[in-house]
Design a protein with these regions (language model features):
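Catalytic strand-loop segment that frames the active site of acyl-thioester-processing enzymes
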Residues: 1-41, 159-173
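Hydrophobic core residues within well-ordered beta-strands of beta-rich domains
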Residues: 3-5, 88, 102
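Hydrophobic residues on conserved beta-strands that form the core of alpha/beta folds
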Residues: 6, 70-73, 103, 115-117
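Conserved positions in beta-strands of structured domains
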Residues: 7-10, 74, 79, 93-95, ...
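HotDog/MaoC-like acyl-thioester-processing domains
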Residues: 14-17, 83-84, 93-173
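Short, hydrophobic/aromatic-enriched beta-strand segments in well-ordered soluble domains
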Residues: 22, 91-94
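Compact, glycine-rich, soluble single-domain proteins
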Residues: 35-42, 47-55, 70
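Hydrophobic beta-strand-centered segment that forms part of the acyl-chain substrate-binding groove
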Residues: 54-89, 123
Length: 173
């Protein structure tokens, strides 16, 4: 089973920046143990949500031709927690995109305020780790992750279609 720690993309600028959201719900079992009586989204899972947002951004920059693996959490600092009822916003920006790796600067927001900064380093596994015997199929970008990006793109197409329809009918009046 694969845990997905983002719910949707709200912005996606290829090779540059992605913004995703995570709605925190008390229905999530991990919140009942962290912490009993005061449930918060564990910072480790916030880092994973940012890594998923950024990993899709990095993978898309190369048309998902390579496996992108989180190589290092360079820095993660949090000023506050997300709690049930909150919506976290993950903003990931590519700082460097090279043949073997990519560097990401990430900011986490809650209710419009910054609550964390995260710097991540990703490796392109097909180039950097060919001797590890990784499976041929792209196990990093499974259908669940690609569905998040495709749903965002479908929403953009639908919005463009609606905007075009409004423009064409408003010219007749």
């Amino acid at each position: 089973m694969r845990w997905i720690w983002i719910d949707a993309f709200t912005e996606f600028e290829s090779r540059k920046r992605a913004v995703a959201i995570k709605n925190i719900s008390l229905a999530e079992e991990h919140l009942h143990d962290h912490f009993p009586g005061y449930p918060v989204m564990p910072p480790s899972l916030v880092i994973e949500g940012m890594a998923q947002t950024a990993g899709i951004l990095v993978g898309e920059a190369r048309d998902f031709a390579e496996k992108v693996i989180l190589a290092k959490v360079q820095r993660a600092e949090f000023d506050d927690y997300g709690v049930p009822g909150d919506q976290l916003v993950y903003e990931a920006t590519i700082e460097s995109l090279k043949e073997a790796a990519a560097g990401i600067a990430g900011t986490v927001y809650r209710r419009g305020s910054k609550i964390g900064t995260i710097s991540l380093l990703f490796s392109h596994a097909d180039r950097a780790m060919t001797d590890l015997g990784l499976p041929e199929h792209n196990f990093v970008f499974n259908d669940q992750f690609l569905d998040l990006l495709n749903t965002y793109r479908a929403g953009l197409r639908q919005k463009q279609f609606r905007d075009d329809s409004v423009d064409s009918t408003s010219g007749d009046a």
